[in-house]
């Protein structure tokens, strides 16, 4: 650190002398230079690998190399990753048995941060390992996020062991079985929500009471994973009500422990997440995942973070939502990353747990200092209301057992583009309700173009009134997601009025949670630090609390008041899940006015 005292020079000198040189970031390059990690890891049951950004190529490659060491030499049999548990099972099926393909399975986890060349290569290495070794390694997500796939997975399991209970869950849990309706769960009447939680509690009790019978009908592992689906569903449903992340890290730690229990005694796991989760940090009196895991497994964990001085990474831009490459210059003086950079080593690791307990290095390792910490979104204004910055305050030895340092980084390489739906200009009133046009009807907008997006096009089928129809359809290897056809309307002429949007629908959908819906969504003014690209709707109203399956033409309608704060609103046609839906005979009305379009 330029201009700092002799003690700081002593720190830099200690870093140079204690550094573990790393020969390469490239996987499949041998393990010789990683030998010092044997002592760092020791008899740990969990090795938790962090990353200073969610979009750095070198961090992913280094973590891949450490997984190779842990699996090949140290007996680890599980990789847990910061991704949704239910969706991750498709990746596990691929790495274990070659079911499906790696690219689809990875994209199906829905976390774009992992949908990169580096993680895809990791998955292919895991598949190679399992094809050539008797001791297998498994892939699990440990995040609770979206309720729908958890609900569907739970119903699938129950259909094998308790068909009557599965049928009851199809009905009772219906609002949570679709990606579109699950976020509206908090709007349901309290009695309806309580009925859902009561049903989940009954299911969890049945897992305990019927354990021996259900294990005999399936397997011990299936029983554990089925129960985890129920727990994750309960966690996700509660999040849809309070929208609070205060328990996020605790829940991730609980899910990790549940997965290790499912895999059996002696299971050892490598975890992948952001430094902010992997470390033993405390944020507003809430521990990070690493802190909770220490409590739960008795410090049988080693936390290895990553750090960098300068370079590129990928993240979604705050203002546009577009996933793109960003770069930063050298770390600011005094930052943990800057001190590591002063040692002048381009690629190294540092054992913090076994560093000196006195002297300049010990004092530095116990001190508070900033460390770069960049998540999935970059470019927050300095005064943003969330208080997001590009650094966290750390105490190095308290937070990490070791760190891997890369002087200059490059951005992770994505497997597919992530481009948000453009922010369309609001029209003064709905148009083309007749659905004219051969492809996507003029004046309407869709999110088509992504992997396994729903296909949207004009249909030859006539509506009940003999009019034109549009078909929204998809047959994908995953069960989540929905296809939308929307129009954005200025709220100026409609504030204070009640809107009604109606359509005739017909569906071909045979999966739980699949079907058709209509919706109205009211949006605030875009601009200022309060929103960036990620605008939180003021309100959303749907035609029903669950998607509608109707092989014959039927009519749906949704009504809602326009909030005074609304700047614009969307009218939308939705096909939830896999299958097909036809829409026609659209009507829009501002009730109480002369407007009827």
Model-derived regions: residue spans:
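Extracellular and organelle-lumenal recognition/adhesion modules and their flexible linkers in secreted
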Residues: 424-597
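Structured catalytic-domain cores with a bias toward divalent-metal coordination
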Residues: 1-425, 510
């Amino acid at each position: 650190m330029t201009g700092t005292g002799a003690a700081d020079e002593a720190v830099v000198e200690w870093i140079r002398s204690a550094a573990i040189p790393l020969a390469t970031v490239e996987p499949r390059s041998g393990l010789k230079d990683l030998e010092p990690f044997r002592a760092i890891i020791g008899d740990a049951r969990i090795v938790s690998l962090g990353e200073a950004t969610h979009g750095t190529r070198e961090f992913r490659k280094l973590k891949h190399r450490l997984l190779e060491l842990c699996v090949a030499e140290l007996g680890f049999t599980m990789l847990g990753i910061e991704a949704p548990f239910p969706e991750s099972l498709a990746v596990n099926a691929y790495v274990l048995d070659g079911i499906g393909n790696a690219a689809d399975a990875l994209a199906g986890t829905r976390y774009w941060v992992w949908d990169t060349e580096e993680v895809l290569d990791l998955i292919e290495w895991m598949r190679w390992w399992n094809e050539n070794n008797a001791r297998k390694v498994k892939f699990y997500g440990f995040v609770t996020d979206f309720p729908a796939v958890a609900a569907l997975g739970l119903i699938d399991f129950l259909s094998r062991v308790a068909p009557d209970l599965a049928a009851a869950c199809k009905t009772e849990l219906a609002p949570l079985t679709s990606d579109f309706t699950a976020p509206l769960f908090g709007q349901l009447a309290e009695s309806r929500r309580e009925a859902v939680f009561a049903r989940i509690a009954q299911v969890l009790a049945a897992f305990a009471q019927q354990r021996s019978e259900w294990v005999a009908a399936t397997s011990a592992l299936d029983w554990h994973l089925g129960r985890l689906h129920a727990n994750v569903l309960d966690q996700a449903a509660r999040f849809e009500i309070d929208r609070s992340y205060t328990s996020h890290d605790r829940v991730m730690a609980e899910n990790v422990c549940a997965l290790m229990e499912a895999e059996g005694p002696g299971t050892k796991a490598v975890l992948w997440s952001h430094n902010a989760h992997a470390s033993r940090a405390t944020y507003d009196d809430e521990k990070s995942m690493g802190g909770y895991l220490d409590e739960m497994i008795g410090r049988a964990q080693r936390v290895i973070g990553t750090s960098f001085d300068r370079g590129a990474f990928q993240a979604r831009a705050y203002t546009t939502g577009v996933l793109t490459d960003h770069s930063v210059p050298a770390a600011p003086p005094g930052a943990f990353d800057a001190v590591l950079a002063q040692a002048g080593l381009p690629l190294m690791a540092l054992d913090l747990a076994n560093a000196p307990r006195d002297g300049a290095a010990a004092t530095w390792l116990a001190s508070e200092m900033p460390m770069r910490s960049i998540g999935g979104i970059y470019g927050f204004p300095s005064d943003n209301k969330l208080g997001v910055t590009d650094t966290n305050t750390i105490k190095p030895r308290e937070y990490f057992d070791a760190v891997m340092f890369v002087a200059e980084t490059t951005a992770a390489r994505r497997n597919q583009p992530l481009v948000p739906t453009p922010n369309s200009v609001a029209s003064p009133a709905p148009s083309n309700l007749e659905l004219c046009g051969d492809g996507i009807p003029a004046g309407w907008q869709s999110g088509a173009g992504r992997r396994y997006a729903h296909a949207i096009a004009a249909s030859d089928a006539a509506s009940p009134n003999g009019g034109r129809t549009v078909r929204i359809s998809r047959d994908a290897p995953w069960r989540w997601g929905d296809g939308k056809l929307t129009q954005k309307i200025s709220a100026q002429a409609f504030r204070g009025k009640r809107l009604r949007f109606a359509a005739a629908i017909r569906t071909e959908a045979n999966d739980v949670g699949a079907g058709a819906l209509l919706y109205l969504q009211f949006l605030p003014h875009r601009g200022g630090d309060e929103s960036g690209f990620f605008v939180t709707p003021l309100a959303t109203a749907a035609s029903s609390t669950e998607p509608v399956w109707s092989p014959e033409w039927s009519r749906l309608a949704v009504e809602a008041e326009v909030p005074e704060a609304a700047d614009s609103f969307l009218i939308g046609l939705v096909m939830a899940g896999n299958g097909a839906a036809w829409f026609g005979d659209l009507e829009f009305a501002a009730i109480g006015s002369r407007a009827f379009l």
